[in-house]
A protein has these predicted regions:
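Catalytic-core regions of glycoside hydrolase
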Residues: 1-105
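Serine/threonine-rich low-complexity intrinsically disordered regions
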Residues: 12, 49, 73, 79, ...
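Arginine residue identity/basic-tract feature
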Residues: 17, 30, 37, 45, ...
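Catalytic cores of secreted or luminal carbohydrate-active enzymes
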Residues: 84-137
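Extracellular/luminal regions of secreted and cell-surface proteins that mediate adhesion/ECM remodeling
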Residues: 122-262
């Protein structure tokens, strides 16, 4: 009690062991002193590095700009805007999935003093999963095995934490054949997809070869979704949004192209 944790020499020897134990159980990493050079120091930065893209990191700033003497920070903050920039840059370095703007005047400060950073996080932070290339057949025969080639990008600096024990890889890519009413008639799960490894700047490609069991002849529309495998039949219920422009069905499937089954 009463111990000051600021400074690289003051951390408890058990800190890493206890934090590792929590992270291995699926806990996320959260710190409420981003932007504070003493309390979010080199020890904290070094600790978070090996967990980046393995567990979500959540940001909350340390300085309450309306009450705290942030001018004393080693970073040399002069204005509330400087503090917000420092917090944002710390979060960018840690690839945070979420930013906590606190409440009241702290929240207002983000929108009043640093709104461009709010806009940047909306467009750059967290995860934004986008298929930049999908090749599907235009014609196929019922009962045959087909090939679908698809490639995915993450446009955000964070990651999609499908690898945490609580989610247990329950989100996957699935393709569907839609009828004229945009209803899913047949769906195919690509179980080899792992959304947690989709990292910004490193597109991930897959070659999927499902077999068309019992597909009736006719014209359909190909569609793709990031499905929740714990719902529906395991391959037909959209779970996560796709960050793409295009035509989506009411149930969240991104329409691709028409296909004829002979």
């Amino acid at each position: 009690a009463g111990k000051d944790w600021a400074g690289e020499e003051n951390f408890d020897p058990d800190s890493k062991r206890l934090l590792d134990s929590a992270c291995e159980k699926g806990f996320s990493l959260r710190h409420d002193a981003f932007g504070m050079r003493e309390y979010y120091g080199q020890w904290e930065r070094n600790y978070v590095k090996p967990w980046i893209m393995k567990r979500p990191v959540l940001l909350e700033g340390g300085w309450i700009v309306s009450k705290h003497p942030y001018h004393n920070d080693p970073s040399g903050y002069k204005t509330a805007k400087d503090v917000r920039i420092g917090e944002f840059e710390d979060g960018q370095e840690a690839h945070v999935n979420m930013m906590d703007f606190r409440v009241g005047d702290e929240t207002m400060s983000w929108f009043r003093d640093a709104y461009p950073l709010v806009e940047r996080f909306i467009s750059e932070g967290g995860y934004r999963l986008y298929p930049d290339s999908i090749v599907v057949p235009k014609e196929m025969k019922s009962g045959s095995r087909i090939k679908i080639v698809h490639r995915w990008n993450n446009l955000g600096w964070g990651y999609c934490p499908t690898n945490i024990p609580q989610w247990n890889q329950k989100y996957k890519v699935a393709f569907a054949l839609l009828n004229q009413d945009n209803q899913v008639v047949y769906s195919y799960l690509d179980n080899n997809t792992d959304l947690s490894v989709w990292i910004k700047g490193y597109p991930t490609s897959y070659e999927f070869t499902p077999k068309l069991h019992g597909v009736k002849k006719g014209t359909y529309t190909w569609a793709v979704a990031l499905v929740d495998t714990t719902k529906g039949n395991g391959s037909n219920v959209k779970g996560l949004d796709i960050s793409a422009k295009g035509t989506f069905t009411n149930s969240g499937w991104l329409k691709l192209s028409e296909v004829t089954v002979k």
